[in-house]
Amino acid sequence: MSRVAKAPVVIPAGVEVKLNGQVISIKGKNGELTRTVHSAVEVKQEENTLTFAPREGAVDGWAQAGTTRALLNSMVIGVTEGFTKKLQLVGVGYRAAVKGNVVNLALGFSHPVDHELPAGITAECPTQTEIVLKGADKQVIGQVAADLRAYRRPEPYKGKGVRYADEVVRTKEAKKK
């Protein structure tokens, strides 16, 4: 059995936590995040910590408590430090540019691809072949990065496409005659 739920989440200075039944909202310098806690989990706030325990009669109580603890810890980190995700464009003529809240991609199609960013997410391009996504919500950052990657996934022969900065693309050997 995992013991993730037994560790409390420490609330740093400058972070405000509001518990309203099963709805919890965490506010910090990077914004405010809200989440509904699973009904099998009981969250208690004591001074500067959040503790988790399963409710009576919940079959999957400890599992849900561990998941809730991990999600709320990510929310606390998000509103204090924020999350970043880096993408690289590999290929001849593959370029990215940011105009406001729209990422403009040239990925070898006959048309440019415009991807609108959701609220709370910012993007910047240090170079034409790099995209850096920043925001407070870890799940939304990952989803936007996955959406951008889905436009042109790295292909296995030359490795061309949109990839995560830390991704290792396994390449195949070309067919031999």
Swiss-Prot record:
- Fetch the Gene3D superfamilies from UniProt: Ribosomal protein L6, alpha-beta domain
- Alphabetized InterPro entries for the sequence: Ribosomal_uL6-like (IPR000702), Ribosomal_uL6-like_a/b-dom_sf (IPR036789), Ribosomal_uL6_a/b-dom (IPR020040), Ribosomal_uL6_bac-type (IPR019906), Ribosomal_uL6_CS (IPR002358)
Fetch the PROSITE patterns from UniProt.
RIBOSOMAL_L6_1
Pfam families reported in the protein's UniProt record: Ribosomal_L6
Q: Which UniProt keywords apply?
A: Ribonucleoprotein, Ribosomal protein, RNA-binding, rRNA-binding
GO-annotated biological processes: cytoplasmic translation
Gene Ontology cellular-component terms listed: cytosolic large ribosomal subunit
**Keyword Transcription on this protein?**
no
UniProt GO MF annotations: rRNA binding; structural constituent of ribosome
State the superkingdom.
Bacteria
Q: How does it assemble?
A: Part of the 50S ribosomal subunit.
Provide the function of this protein. Answer: This protein binds to the 23S rRNA, and is important in its secondary structure. It is located near the subunit interface in the base of the L7/L12 stalk, and near the tRNA binding site of the peptidyltransferase center.
- Family statement: Belongs to the universal ribosomal protein uL6 family.
Task: Please name the NCBIfam families in this protein's record.
Answer: L6_bact
Full protein name: Large ribosomal subunit protein uL6
Organism listed in the record: Yersinia pestis
Which gene is the coding source of this polypeptide chain?
rplF
